[in-house]
Design a protein with these regions (language model features):
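Positively charged n-region of N-terminal signal peptides that target proteins for export
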Residues: 1-4
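A domain-level signal for the mature, folded cores of soluble proteins
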Residues: 20-121, 143-289
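Beta-strand signatures of extracellular beta-sandwich domains
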Residues: 122-124, 317
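Tryptophan-centered short beta-strand motifs
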Residues: 133-142
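Residue-level detector of functionally pivotal "anchor" positions at catalytic/ligand-binding pockets or at interdomain
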Residues: 286-316, 325-326
Length: 326
């Protein structure tokens, strides 16, 4: 009987280990800042939608291994919070995590750096210290290559409008998320959250703009440490949990993490291309993902020419260079 019980316990343990998914298990929160896609696409928004219905759509888009969905976080401060069905281990000398974006390189160079579609998002990670399965424990920022120039304890207030969305930060600077002819929804403001104002707090990265002139602005990717910053198939897109820091920017050691929050890290107006906004296509535990041969990683964004026009392909979906679905 004892032998039979041991066999059953071993079998159950094996099934439990096999059941672990390398990909996002659940999306817990979605709080986008204003932006040109907000209230229109990524996720799609319909009349009568509520925070709960939109959160469910984001969860459906990002959870699992489909690899063809994308969400936008809007301008600086917008965020999404998700978790895995297991603890992502911090293995010494290895990259542990990847958050998938839709970055591509244009083939141009600026000051020795490759020009790209980088829209960097800051990655925050958290343990499940209290064991309740919720992202309510302390967060730690992943300090990427621009961390030394970043501004912590930054805050922006956005004000509802059906025109340009005005904002003011805690330093007294002002600006706006400008409407453009490409996106004609009633408002660029996430109205299901508020019809008045929204306040976002976090870390502000230095601008990574490259001005081509004639109103066309591109970005230069940071070296490492951010979401939607380097192509998905690049080592520079992968994250080492040893890069985690506390609120004062001091390194912390985490044995493992369960939850991830990604937040648009820059406040940049791309001219005719609209605001810079982090886009997310999923995430994976690299220690599990690299051991699975029957489940491919999320596809990278690829440049292609169709009918003489540059387009961006992510999986089975195609977008123009301004992010409009074709």
């Amino acid at each position: 009987m004892k032998k039979l019980l041991s066999v059953i316990l071993i079998a159950c343990a094996s099934l439990s280990a096999y059941a672990q998914s390398p990909y996002i298990h659940k999306v817990y929160a979605y709080h986008p800042a204003p932006g040109q896609f907000i209230g229109e696409h990524y996720p799609d928004v319909y009349a009568g939608d509520t925070y709960e219905s939109i959160l469910a759509r984001v969860d459906s888009a990002l959870s699992g291994a489909s690899g063809n969905a994308m969400i936008t976080l809007g301008a600086w401060g917008g965020s999404v919070t998700f978790g895995f069905d297991h603890d992502v281990q911090n293995r010494p000398g290895e990259h542990d995590l990847i958050v998938y974006g839709n970055v591509y390189f244009t083939g141009e160079m600026a000051d020795g750096h490759a020009v790209s579609s980088s829209e960097p998002g800051i990655i925050w990670v958290s343990e499940d210290v209290n064991g309740n399965g919720l992202p309510d424990d302390p967060w730690y920022e992943i300090a990427g290559s621009a961390s030394a120039e970043a501004m912590r304890e930054y805050q922006v207030t956005y004000y509802y409008s059906t025109g340009d969305v005005e904002w003011i930060d805690n330093l007294g600077n002002t600006g706006s998320i400008k409407r453009n002819s490409w996106h004609q929804q009633d408002t660029y403001f996430p109205y299901w959250e508020s019809m008045d104002s929204l306040v976002f707090s976090g870390t502000l990265l230095p601008p990574n703009m490259y001005d081509k002139g004639n109103g066309v602005i591109r970005s230069v990717a940071y070296d490492y440490g951010y979401a939607d910053n380097q192509p998905n198939d690049s080592l520079a897109a992968q994250i080492d949990l040893d890069w985690a820091v506390d609120a004062e920017g001091q390194p912390v050691h985490l044995d493992a993490i369960r939850f991830v929050k990604v937040q648009t890290g820059v406040q940049v107006d791309w001219g005719i291309s609209g605001e810079m906004s982090t886009e997310i296509c999923g995430a994976a535990d690299l220690h599990i993902a690299t051991s699975l041969t029957d489940r491919p990683l999320k596809p990278k964004a690829e440049k292609r020419i169709r009918n003489g026009q540059l387009v961006i392909c992510i999986g089975s979906k195609t977008y123009d260079i301004l992010g409009k679905r074709l």
